[in-house]
Amino acid sequence: YQLFLQRITEDRHHRHINRWWLYAAAVLALFIASYASYKSGEHGVKSSFADIEIEAPQGSRTKLNLPDGTLVWLNAGSRIAYSQGFGVDGRSVKMSGEGYFEVKKNPELPFTVKTENLLVRDIGTKFNVRDYHEDTEAVVLLSEGKVVLNDAHSADLYYLTNNQRAVLNKSTGKIEVDSYVASNSTKWINGYIQLNGESIVDIAKYFERIYNVRITVSDKRKLKYHFYGNFKRNEQSLTEVLDAMSKTGKFKYSIKGHNVTIY
């Protein structure tokens, strides 16, 4: 009889322990499921926030300050985008067109500019990036500090210091670095047009953006010409600029509304 009672007591004890483990396992499973749901929801919330986009339409320039204090100028026909968590989760922007950056220094969060063809990284510097989709080249000009960059399709790194320029040939994928007075190519911030030997094709694309017109070079023999000069965009109309350039005798032009023909 005592042995029978002992077995009953042991069976009850085992059933009590088994129920406790089942209860603990259920609580643990509920916790895991809740945590997984929370993380999934957290990711969903982050993903649901659209990036902030700012644009400089054709014929205009735009000045802005990013949440971390970085100053940005966008040239005509350019766009920049960054996440809602910029300055907290990281400092990365996407850009198309041309932008000038005065980056707020923060060694713990490097600043990154990603374009269609380039990836530029730095901590706190002043630099200019130009990468329009229709251009044959993408260019980075460093005014102050240091940056490291690479072709978006290559892991090869290039380091720039003060007054250096990196030029990516989009057709070959080759990047060349040389010395350059960076201020010459950032005068657009103050409304200047600086021509440094660009071809008539590149100049036409540039004028299309800043004057919001359509330019056609009808005489293909003119494509070989390159031009130098300085103009004040806010004070000189497109007609005045083309008049000055045409006095070289290398081309003539006509304007009908927003359409310009160079011949």
Predicted regions and their residues:
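Disordered, charged N-terminal biogenesis/targeting segments of membrane/secreted proteins
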Residues: 1-13
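A residue-level detector for the "anchor" residue at the start of short, highly conserved motifs
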Residues: 10-24, 31-263
